Amino acid sequence: MKRILVSVTGLLAVLALGYALGPRHQFASAPAKTELPVTDLATLEQTIAESEKRAGLKPDNEARIVWADSSRKVKTPVSMVYIPGFGATWAEGDPIHKKLAKHFGCNLYLARPEEHGLTSPDAFKGLTPDKYKASAERALAIGKALGDRVVVIGTSAGGMLTLYLAQRHPEIAGLVLYSPCIAVVNPALKLATKPWGAQIMKQVLNGEHVTVTTYKPDRAQYWLTRYHINGLITLQTMLDEYMTPDEFSKVKQPLFMGYYYKDEDHQDKVVSVAAMLAMYEQLGTSADKKQKVAFPKAGEHVIASHFTSGDLDGVYRATEQFLTNTIRLVPVSGTLAVR
């Protein structure tokens, strides 16, 4: 018996070593450029439009500027940047982002993260953490060109990118996080960055692609319904590296966090509410400059979109009050406040 136990123990040790030394997905390190080629705002808008035309996008998924005053197109005291979540584009936050920008007289940049909105069934095949981060950095740079101060709004993985930016840019005036992706509900995604992660995912998914069949056609226009598993590996890599207590402590800006939670049976089923709440407590933001609000009527992970949310009014009102009372944004009336 002792000899058998020794043999079994040895076999398990060999298997464990084989697993630990197994292949991990490697990303090429080639940071994309984030600097803006132009400073003139009208030319900047044209440059964005021309770049988006070449990207191979589904209709109406382009990144764009929504001007506080489209007849003048000038810099405003405050601009807003919206960063959508994994696989989504600007409609994921519509109409909340537009209503907030209009209410406060802000130029608004609706960003499109790297490889989002593509027509290609291989969307995300070329996505890397460096490219994902660079697209967020570029969005912030555009926001700075549009306003003297910048408020960044992010949903889900866009919230993750918003926190990433906040950790590195203390000059950001404020943060709005809707259902931020700190960890996904399904713990299996954590295997994506472990040894044999890509191989395991291919076996589970029976291939290299994820297909989503639950979206109605109008929503599917603004969300990817088929994408390469490399996107999930990129997402989990970002979560592993940047959604940590040490990184959260670097965030000092005023912060609003909204999420769907009614009770244990009725809550966000996509990203972890528990992880969000833990992150909230670990922020470097002072208690009087941050606010968390559960929206039990939202009913869905995406709480700020007309496609999904059951409580758009509640989400808008709570966010508007925070921006007014905590960040001290001033609503406009009549003529728009511009620089």
What annotation goes with each model-predicted range?
Residues 68-74, 220-299, 313-324, 330, ...:
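Serine-hydrolase catalytic core
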Residues 112-117, 181, 298:
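Short beta-to-alpha linker loops that shape the active-site pocket of alpha/beta-hydrolase fold enzymes
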Residues 5-21:
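Hydrophobic membrane-insertion alpha-helices, especially the h-region
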Residues 153-162:
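Gly/Ala-rich beta-loop-alpha elbow adjacent to hydrolase catalytic centers
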Residues 118-146:
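Catalytic nucleophile-loop/oxyanion-hole region of alpha/beta-hydrolase
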Residues 32-62, 180-247, 293-295, 303-315:
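The alpha/beta-hydrolase serine catalytic core
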Residues 58-113:
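Short, surface-exposed "cap/lid" segments of acyl-processing enzymes
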